[in-house]
Amino acid sequence: MSEEIIEDMLEEVAPQVAGDYPEIAQRYKAGEELTDEELDIIADVAISILRSILSHFDADNSPIDEYEGDEGELILDVTAPDLAVLIGRHGRTLDALQVMFSLLVSRKLGFRYPVVVDVEGYKSRRQDKVASMAQSAAERAIRTHKSVSLPPMNAYERRLVHIALRGNDAVDTHSEGSDPDRHVVIVAR
């Protein structure tokens, strides 16, 4: 991804979400809870950037549902027909979109706030599938007393596995390998 593309995207978005956010950044980095007003500002910035990206796919007028995820992250779910092109094969296009989007939001705000882009609930469905896969693998690891390796996953999905099993005292999880073959290993205690 070229720095020029990122800078061009930021210039496109800048007038729509003009502002300086050092106070929010300072409070967030200090671990303070952000106010509803500050969270609304972050959401406005993120939605403006997402709409700018969507305009390149002629989808900037698509509805965007905004809600809070289980881990406190802001989730923006683009809901419109014919957006499969934004998901891509096995979600790879959506993963690339997420990386670019996160970089743009971080650059604009001056700090990294967790904002997840979803399309038609794809990530939500995938999250359920990954959590189910993790639970099944944990049960198998406990039953067989052997380590169980899951298939290679991106960083987001590996994190979902670790989160899904962190409350299970009968297993430990860790990641092995390097991308694109990095995967989670589940070991019975």
Residue locations for each model-derived region?
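RNA-contacting regions in translation and RNA-metabolism proteins
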Residues: 1-189
